[in-house]
Amino acid sequence: MADAAVIEKLEAGFKKLEAATDCKSLLKKYLTKEVFDKLKDKKTSLGATLLDVIQSGVENLDSGVGIYAPDAEAYTLFAPLFDPIIEDYHVGFKQTDKHPNKDFGDVNSFVNVDPEGKFVISTRVRCGRSMQGYPFNPCLTESQYKEMEAKVSSTLSSLEGELKGTYYPLTGMSKEVQQKLIDDHFLFKEGDRFLQAANACRYWPAGRGIYHNDNKTFLVWVNEEDHLRIISMQMGGDLGQVFRRLTSAVNEIEKRIPFSHHDRLGFLTFCPTNLGTTVRASVHIKLPKLAANREKLEEVAGKYNLQVRGTRGEHTEAEGGIYDISNKRRMGLTEFQAVKEMQDGILELIKMEKEM
């Protein structure tokens, strides 16, 4: 049972949401009085409450979603709030649906989406993973952060071949290394206001770090937003090569580290937008004609289940006409299908650009 001080904060937060008439978050849409009353005094076995779930969305009324999962159990205990939000965000993934088992499919069927090198600057595929037996950011202790880092860094240092590389802990990082990682766009910063408000940045930088291979085409972020963000990327449009590298890395890491998986929701992540496959396949792409009107670009992209972001990701502008375009769907389809959807959509956008 949540304690009185927490419930008091929850009541105040709920009032604030109710009063915020211009708030368009999914939290506001689905946290009805009925759902609120049903959940406000519940507590997971690790001590997480509804407050941990909603505080970022209460503090940041301009959130798109507004909720995070403090631990794996939260997805079940607070399901009356999570399930409708998941269904709304992951369009078509109903509350009765079950996410399919992991399936990377035929990794050799992916192609170079821009063999002439005219449109696509770079290609990236990432997935998120959570380590079994550990809560998510808001509930982690400093010693758990360090313990997780030790497990992950020893696993990564055993990788071979193309994946072989170096682990750089954020704790005690020298200015030179820091600058080198910033120049490569590898270094992640302490979380933005959405993550800060969700208590995702405690004990920073303990347990946080970055691994990359010698070619700088494979990267792992440790304890940033998720326990693990596994990233494969390179210049140009060779999606096949990027995806094959990612799948071989995930398969290797999985042999040594058990990941949190939910029968219905797939792989579990801190933010419900990343559940399921957790896969985000993206390109940095220049489409000057299509992008002359961003609204039009977004509309066309939407038809192919693609999401358009600014050059530096969420909440940013396009610099020099370069957009970040990725698959929007992560749930209710396999990893193979998610990446295929992105490949088909990008091929179509390039074809349209050429025809304009």
From Swiss-Prot:
Induction: By LPS immunostimulation. In hemocytes, expression increases sharply at 3 hours, decreases slightly at 6 hours, increases significantly again at 24 hours and decreases at 48 hours after LPS injection. In muscle, expressed less than the control in the first 6 hours, then the expression increases strikingly from 6 to 24 hours and decreases at 48 hours after LPS injection. GO terms for cellular component: extracellular space. No change in activity after supplementation with 10 mM glucose. However, activity decreases significantly when glucose concentration is higher than 50 mM and almost all activity is lost with 200 mM glucose. Activity is significantly increased after treatment with 10 mM and 50 mM ATP. However, activity drops significantly with 200 mM ATP. Inhibited by 10-200 mM alpha-ketoglutarate. No change in activity after incubation with 10-200 mM L-citrulline, L-ornaline or glycerol. The keyword ATP-binding applies. It catalyses: L-arginine + ATP = N(omega)-phospho-L-arginine + ADP + H(+). Keywords: Allergen, ATP-binding, Kinase, Nucleotide-binding, Transferase. It holds the Pfam family ATP-gua_Ptrans. ATP binds at residues 122-126, 185, 229, 280-284, 309-314. It comes from the Eukaryota. One of its GO terms (molecular function) is creatine kinase activity. Residues 9-91 form the Phosphagen kinase N-terminal domain. Residues 119-356 form the Phosphagen kinase C-terminal domain. Its EC number is 2.7.3.3. Expressed in muscle (at protein level). Expressed in muscle, heart, nerve, stomach and hemocytes, with the highest expression in muscle. Very low expression in eyestalk and intestine. Not expressed in hepatopancreas, gill and skin. L-arginine binds at G64, V65, G66, I67, Y68, E225, C271, E314. Gene3D superfamilies: ATP:guanido phosphotransferase, N-terminal domain, Glutamine synthetase/guanido kinase, catalytic domain. GO terms for biological process: phosphocreatine biosynthetic process. Catalyzes the reversible transfer of high energy ATP gamma-phosphate group to L-arginine. Belongs to the ATP:guanido phosphotransferase family. This is Arginine kinase Lit v 2. It comes from Penaeus vannamei.
